[in-house]
């Protein structure tokens, strides 16, 4: 355990000088003795100086303070003892319930699984959310991105997915809060407690008030815990909210580390950092990690380098649209922009595939006719087009659904709709079975039977 001393402090980036014969390796964890602060080595600058990122606030540090090299990477507690606990980037519990009861720890930097260990799956994961199950189905062991700008419902969608999957599938989950609001983390904890699924979820938080070092590494902390469950042969869910903040934390420290910025001011290593993280989120022959990641889209621009880099790694993309949210349709999923590799007749079957494509064709036709309607009015449309518009508006409303986690806002009880009922409902609307019902009957209901009941009371 070699000793060094601080020689320079620039915000979250700290230079430490060690004797030449005992320079720490890259990714080694160093400890500032007087404050207990952990530093992670990023670069060796020569002359015994290493450049580090602080895993906490650098307030109160000064030059000359002694620093000890731990000789290993940051390691965090893993295993079932982490379930029901809230931890920070170093795996230290922050829920005031005492230490995590496990001796087992794993380093947060690990190699991705080897190619011959990987396993692909086409088994579907039913979420109970109609628009997702129908148009962008999730694969067990796949990676899903929830894309959306500010305030279109990424976190609410994610909370609903966790609630549905944790209750209906009774698997283990790891929730990683990367640079999001502390209030949401608090709400989420109480939501899980009330739903009685807290004992199946490990929570790792590095919120937006934390220094960039915490936000940069907290995603890896959560991932390491999920990898342990996978290696024990379990099927685990990894939720990351928000993967954009992981990129952003890298951007914040990149310039301080002396790197030239690339497009839009992002770090030049953007693709590499994202790839390192995403390649570890993989399913092996032992167990699976199904990952659902919220992706903030800056200024609603999907071509921004950060969301654009994330796209390449995903099996399904759920795009949340401000236009749909403004119509009052929640979840505000864009049915024409959201995609999934699983939407293939060989995976989902012919009936599901044809209904999903029929829904998209009807909505696309309605989108094309909207300009004509805006200029000339509905009366100028042909009888066929009028029918298409009427069905499209019913479909649009039937894609909305009351959420369990939003009951406090909407006042209506949440609904879990099975895939079978979802396909049955949309198939009936497309075939014209419900042409006689008013479109309001389809808004914020679960299955199609509920829409029929609602129509009777209108």
Swiss-Prot record:
Does Cell inner membrane count among this protein's keywords?
A: yes
Q: Which InterPro entries match?
A: AAA+_ATPase (IPR003593), ATP-synt_VA_C (IPR055190), ATP_synth_F1_bsu (IPR005722), ATPase_a/bsu_AS (IPR020003), ATPase_alpha/beta_chains (IPR050053), ATPase_F1/V1/A1_a/bsu_N (IPR004100), ATPase_F1/V1/A1_a/bsu_N_sf (IPR036121), ATPase_F1/V1/A1_a/bsu_nucl-bd (IPR000194)
The family database entries (PROSITE patterns) matched by this protein are listed as: ATPASE_ALPHA_BETA (PS00152)
Presence of the UniProt keyword Ligase in the record: no
One of the Pfam families matching this protein, by short name: ATP-synt_VA_C
Q: Tell me the residue numbers annotated for binding ATP.
A: 148-155
Keyword annotations: ATP synthesis, ATP-binding, Cell inner membrane, Cell membrane, CF(1), Hydrogen ion transport, Ion transport, Membrane, Nucleotide-binding, Translocase, Transport
Q: Which Gene3D superfamilies match?
A: 2.40.10.170, Bovine Mitochondrial F1-atpase, Atp Synthase Beta Chain, Chain D, domain 3, P-loop containing nucleotide triphosphate hydrolases
Q: Which GO terms describe its molecular function?
A: ATP binding; ATP hydrolysis activity; proton-transporting ATP synthase activity, rotational mechanism
Per the record, what are the reactions this protein catalyses? ATP + H2O + 4 H(+)(in) = ADP + phosphate + 5 H(+)(out)
| A Gene Ontology cellular-component term | plasma membrane
List the subcellular locations: Cell inner membrane
Self-association and partners:
F-type ATPases have 2 components, CF(1) - the catalytic core - and CF(0) - the membrane proton channel. CF(1) has five subunits: alpha(3), beta(3), gamma(1), delta(1), epsilon(1). CF(0) has three main subunits: a(1), b(2) and c(9-12). The alpha and beta chains form an alternating ring which encloses part of the gamma chain. CF(1) is attached to CF(0) by a central stalk formed by the gamma and epsilon chains, while a peripheral stalk is formed by the delta and b chains.
Family per similarity comment: Belongs to the ATPase alpha/beta chains family.
Q: Which HAMAP family match?
A: ATP_synth_beta_bact (MF_01347)
The entry's function note states: Produces ATP from ADP in the presence of a proton gradient across the membrane. The catalytic sites are hosted primarily by the beta subunits.
Q: This chain belongs to which protein, by name?
A: ATP synthase subunit beta
* Source organism (scientific name): Laribacter hongkongensis (strain HLHK9)
């Amino acid at each position: 355990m070699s000793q060094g001393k601080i020689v320079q402090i620039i915000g979250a980036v700290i230079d430490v000088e060690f004797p030449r014969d005992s320079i720490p390796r890259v990714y080694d964890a160093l400890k500032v003795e007087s404050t207990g602060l952990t530093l992670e080595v990023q670069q060796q600058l020569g002359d015994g100086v290493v450049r580090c990122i602080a895993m906490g606030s650098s307030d109160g540090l000064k030059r000359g303070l002694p620093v000890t090299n731990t000789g290993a990477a940051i390691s965090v507690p893993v295993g079932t003892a982490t379930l029901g606990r809230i931890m920070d980037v170093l795996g230290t519990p922050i829920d005031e319930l005492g230490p995590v009861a496990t001796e087992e720890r794993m380093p947060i930097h690990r190699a991705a699984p080897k190619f011959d260990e990987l396993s692909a799956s086409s088994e579907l994961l039913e979420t109970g959310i109609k628009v997702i199950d129908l148009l962008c189905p999730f694969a067990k062991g796949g990676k899903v991105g929830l894309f959306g700008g500010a305030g279109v419902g990424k976190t609410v969608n994610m909370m609903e997915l966790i609630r549905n999957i944790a209750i209906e599938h009774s698997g283990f989950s790891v929730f990683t809060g990367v640079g999001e609001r502390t209030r949401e983390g608090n709400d989420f904890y109480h939501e899980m407690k009330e739903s009685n699924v807290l004992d199946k979820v490990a929570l790792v938080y590095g919120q937006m008030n934390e220094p960039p070092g915490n936000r940069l590494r907290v995603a890896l902390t959560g991932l390491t815990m999920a990898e342990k469950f996978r290696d024990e042969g379990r099927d685990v869910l990894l939720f990351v909210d928000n993967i954009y903040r992981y990129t952003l934390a890298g951007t914040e420290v990149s310039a301080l580390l002396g790197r030239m910025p690339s497009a839009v001011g992002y770090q030049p290593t953007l693709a590499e950092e994202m790839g390192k993280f995403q390649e570890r989120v993989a399913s092996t022959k032992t167990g699976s990690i199904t990952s659902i990641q919220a992706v903030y889209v800056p200024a609603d621009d999907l071509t921004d380098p950060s969301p654009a880099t994330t796209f390449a790694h995903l099996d399904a993309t759920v795009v949340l649209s401000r236009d749909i949210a403004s119509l009052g349709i929640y979840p505000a999923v864009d049915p024409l922009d959201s995609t999934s590799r699983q939407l293939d007749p060989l995976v989902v079957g012919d009936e599901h595939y044809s209904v999903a494509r029929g829904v998209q064709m009807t909505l696309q036709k309605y989108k094309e006719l909207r300009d004509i309607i805006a200029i000339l009015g509905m009366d100028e449309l042909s009888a066929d087009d009028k029918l298409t518009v009427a069905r499209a508006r019913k479909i649009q409303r039937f894609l909305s659904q009351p959420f369990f986690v939003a009951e406090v806002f909407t006042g209506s009880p949440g609904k879990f709709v099975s895939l079978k009922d979802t396909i049955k409902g949309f198939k009936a609307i497309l075939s014209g079975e419900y042409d006689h019902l008013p479109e309001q009957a389809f808004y914020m209901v679960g299955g199609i039977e509920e829409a029929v009941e609602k129509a009777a009371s209108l």
